[in-house]
Amino acid sequence: MSGVADTTHAPRLPDPLRLGRVHLTVSTLDGSIAFYQRALGLQLHDRDGRVATMGAGGEDLLVLVEEPGAAPGGRHAGLFHYALLFETRRQLARAVKRLASTQTRIEGASDHGVSESIYLRDPDDNGIELYADRPREQWPPSRIPGERVEIFTLALDMEDLMREVDGEQPRARAGAGIVVGHLHLHVGDVEQGLAFYRGVLGFEVMVNLGTAAMVSAGGYHHHLGFNVWLGSDVKPRPPQTAGLREWTVLLASREELAVVRARIAATGLYVRADHGGFVVRDPWETAVAFRVR
């Protein structure tokens, strides 16, 4: 990351912080809209040519940008998965019931200690996680010095989860209150990822597994994960490839936005003004937008 100052001990990002819209490249907009409506119960909020926004009736969650003929994601940096956070365990169970009723393939189901998660993919192979958090006081503390929580992976007790919706019929639409909870990225080097996301942007390290790390603001288990599971030499996402175009960090005020922007710019990183906020890129050209919520 040449030209960027060493800011290993950069000030932390302000709390409260949460994530906003996830921008995805898709190959066929009509097909993607149909998938997200049918499988996830999302609503089409707006469509303008080859761009559509979708959500659960409140704020936009996804911005889908059509690039006809875009190839599925392959072995490159970028999206591992984005994660939609449900307000309650019952809402997550309703989402699973909808997936079953629409015969949507579930790739995995995991108990992470801090949360319960369902994994699937959209038609362009973009990874999706649907999850519900356990109460914060139930999050397992880490036994490793310097780490905040323990995030493990066990098989999810699906039978117990589905007891939440015994007797209910599948619901065509997702309930309100869904937000983007976190993202997980493929990167080429975890330490370089930490130098950027902790040292430049100001996230706090929650977990460091060597081949993967998880960072957050305000003590959340993670707003972002990144890993080298595709290899340590992955390159940026090629043009005309489906995947992540941009993800969004939402700050509480314009004053906070200005402070964070000035601090990041002082490291020498290029900061581009955009729609009342700003955008920066990580070492693998993944775009991160900062805006006021």
Each model region followed by its residue ranges:
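Exposed loop/turn and edge beta-strand positions of beta-sandwich/beta-sheet ligand-binding modules
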Residues: R18, D48, G78, V114, ...
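Conserved short beta-strand elements that form part of the metal-binding/catalytic scaffold
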Residues: Q43-A77, G127-R134, E204-A242, P283, ...
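Vicinal oxygen chelate
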Residues: G3, P16-G20, L24-D30, A83-G127, ...
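N-terminal beta-strand motif that seeds the catalytic metal site of vicinal oxygen chelate
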Residues: M1-D30, H81-L84, P135-E191, L244-W247
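Conserved small-residue-rich
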Residues: Y36, A172-S216
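Conserved acetyl-CoA-binding loop of GNAT-fold acetyltransferases
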Residues: A39-H45, G199-V205, A265, L269
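An N-terminus-focused feature that recognizes amino-terminal "leader" regions
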Residues: M1-G69, H76-L84, K97
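Active-site-adjacent scaffolding segments
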Residues: R50-R134, Q138-P145
